[in-house]
Amino acid sequence: MPEICPICGLPKDLCVCEEIAKEEQKIKVYVTKRRFGKLMTVVDGFDADLIDVKDLAKKLKDICACGGTVKKDSIELQGDHRKKAEEILIKMGFSKDMIDVR
């Protein structure tokens, strides 16, 4: 018996909750200064119930070749990676209209 998704009620292999969630999320990508004047790119606005933020952070860190962490449903990447992060999020299925890069 296949597992049932608790959100949509469909079997896990037919579930589209994550794809729908990717299209509806309003994601903000911005840079802040941290200790000693270092820059940090913050990717914020994920719904942690629908998207695996830790897995997404791992993919972003691997592709950007930088360090980073997950804090309160936001991803922090070391350095200025705004353009690269936007391109990666679009390739992962997030809507370009819903990504706000500052």
UniProtKB/Swiss-Prot annotation:
Alphabetically ordered keywords of this record: Protein biosynthesis, Translation regulation
Cleavable signal peptide: none
Gene3D superfamilies: SUI1-like domain
One Pfam family linked to the record: SUI1
GO molecular function: mRNA binding; translation initiation factor activity
Top-level taxon of the source organism: Archaea
Biological process, per Gene Ontology: formation of translation preinitiation complex; regulation of translation; translation reinitiation
NCBIfam families per UniProt: PRK00939.1, SUI1_rel
Family: Belongs to the SUI1 family.
Name under which the protein is recorded: Protein translation factor SUI1 homolog
